[in-house]
Amino acid sequence: MLAILAIVAPVFALIGSGYLARRIGVIGPHAVSELNRVVVYLALPALLFDVMAHASWSVLYQPDFIAAFGLACGAVFYVTLAISLIAGRRLATASLDGLLGAYANTAYIGFPMLLMIYGKESLVPVTIASILTVCVLFASAMVLIELASHAERHPLRLAGKVLGSLGRNPILVAPILGVAWGATGLGLPASAETFLTLLGGAASPLALVVIGLFLAEPRPIAASETRTAVGLAAVKLVIHPAVTALLTIAFAVPPKLAAMAVLLAALPTGTGPFMLAEFYRLPAVVTSGAILLSTLAALMTLPLLMYFTGISLAP
């Protein structure tokens, strides 16, 4: 319990620092939008390019793990999306709901937690999960939000507009360029490596600070929004790992890899959905609430999962 608390404490500290800075007036009301643009246009693209440029595809080729974790993410995303649409939410916000239910905080919590449990052998599966989450799942939600944002109904013209918007989106372009660079077999200069490491490393911490800034703004919160945030946090912490566990059995994933997949799926929601909400100017009350609630609740759900599955943190 204390070991998990030590891992997630910096998450709350970053959110709290943003909240406090806004409440005492050190940072102004426009900071949420402007700082989020720093994340979306600079830090996150650098991180995604770096991850994809250094991906060793021969090492990352773990078909059973990829199938189980990837299909679980997709199933939770699209089923949650469908339920939200049936409940009357629009496609853009329903896409965020789907992302909230399936977007695990693999980078900020997953890497250190699994490193404590499994050591360096956890790096490959966590990297795979991060690529599936940050690139594939994130891009899927982005495409749907782009589709929802265009009024054009002619299929070809709509496709052209959506592709044009996606082609100008650094969050999607950066990993594609990273894959292209990695395929050349050329290494990056040391100065470029340092640049990407420094800039990419700011993505998650800065996004957490921005969430704190957002939460500090006084705004009315409807009871329905609170219920939705609680429900989405439950989907992330209970349904997502349960579906992943079933699929690891279906695909006969080796026990240790299966345990890693379930633990990664059981992580709280990462900051990606909030970045998208701010980037597309979508309502972010439910999004920020679900991220905060899932992170708080994970302090109880992760130890319970480890207890019932016999997993223990290394001292």
Task: Give the location of each predicted region.
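Alpha-helical transmembrane segments of multi-pass small-molecule/ion transporters
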Residues: 1-315
